[in-house]
Amino acid sequence: MSQNLIRIATRKSPLAMWQAEFVKAELEKIHEGLTVELLPMSTKGDIILDTPLAKVGGKGLFVKELEVAMLEGKADIAVHSMKDVPVEFPEGLGLEVICEREDPRDAFVSNTYKTIEDLPQGAVVGTSSLRRQCQIRAARPDLVIKDLRGNVGTRLAKLDAGNYDAIILAAAGLKRLKLEERIASFISAEQSLPANGQGAVGIECRTDDARVKALLAPLEHAETRMRVTAERAMNTRLEGGCQVPIGAYAEIDGDTLSLRGLVGNPDGSQIITAASSGNKADAEKLGVALAEELLAKGAKTILDAVYANA
């Protein structure tokens, strides 16, 4: 294979294609003479659209097919939304790069209302995320939450068709797709704690591919890596997949990393929170310790019930 070629395995959704195109542009800008090709693929999570994500089951719904392509030598790298990346990687693959984070917040999208507070009693809100559901229900038990699947365009079309009064989406995805004008308001991390890794893009490759690793190295963003490492460590200790009522959000100020975590009952009846801070070099330890605190407060009971119903 040409030393001047990199092939990116990517999902076919507009957002996944944007992420792959972004990495392609960055690589070609940094490395003169490098050619980057995209290999668009469908994954299990893209194909099964009529079932709530929590019931489709399994970790890595959106990445498995991409990983097979790399292991078979059909692709060199895969670009992922960090919130979709499983905790464990198949032998021979690893997360080589985490790019600088985009806005990690959730976005409130509605054609009629400005904020969640403005929604009338009984208004219908669309989201397939158990994390968002538990936080919305805790704040507004009078709202009706309905499942919402599909890519960003499909979800917006369902809102526009009048199926929902409002929907909740990741702000980063809307910004990347140049749809920021659809955002009625941003939901602060205090109001809706983001998913671990939300807004960050990760690049996976073969662990023994020195050529590709060297080409990818300039895209690594150290601060984002530390923040996401803490968030993912917490999620891992809680044994969370990508469809769980878990929120994790880290911020860095100087050498101090502050981490907030949340586990909630999807019906909003119970939300367990914890927060801690420490040296950013101990990101992983901080994440594990915060998970232990959540477990000590009763998080396991909630998560066991969620997994039993999945």
Curated annotation (Swiss-Prot):
Gene Ontology biological-process entries: protoporphyrinogen IX biosynthetic process
Gene Ontology terms for molecular function: hydroxymethylbilane synthase activity
Species classification: Bacteria, Pseudomonadati, Pseudomonadota, Gammaproteobacteria, Alteromonadales
Catalytic activity: 4 porphobilinogen + H2O = hydroxymethylbilane + 4 NH4(+)
Modified residues (S-(dipyrrolylmethanemethyl)cysteine): 242
A cellular component term, taken from the record's GO annotations: cytoplasm
Keywords assigned by UniProt, alphabetized: Porphyrin biosynthesis, Transferase
Subunit structure: Monomer.
Gene field: hemC
UniProt function note: Tetrapolymerization of the monopyrrole PBG into the hydroxymethylbilane pre-uroporphyrinogen in several discrete steps.
Similarity-based family: Belongs to the HMBS family.
CDD domains in alphabetical order: PBP2_EcHMBS_like (cd13646)
Cofactor stoichiometry and binding remark: Binds 1 dipyrromethane group covalently.
Cofactors, names only: dipyrromethane
Pathway: Porphyrin-containing compound metabolism; protoporphyrin-IX biosynthesis; coproporphyrinogen-III from 5-aminolevulinate: step 2/4
Record's protein name: Porphobilinogen deaminase
Miscellaneous comment in the UniProt entry for this protein: The porphobilinogen subunits are added to the dipyrromethane group.
Keyword Manganese among UniProt keywords: no
Top enzyme class: transferase
Pfam families: Porphobil_deam, Porphobil_deamC
EC numbers: 2.5.1.61
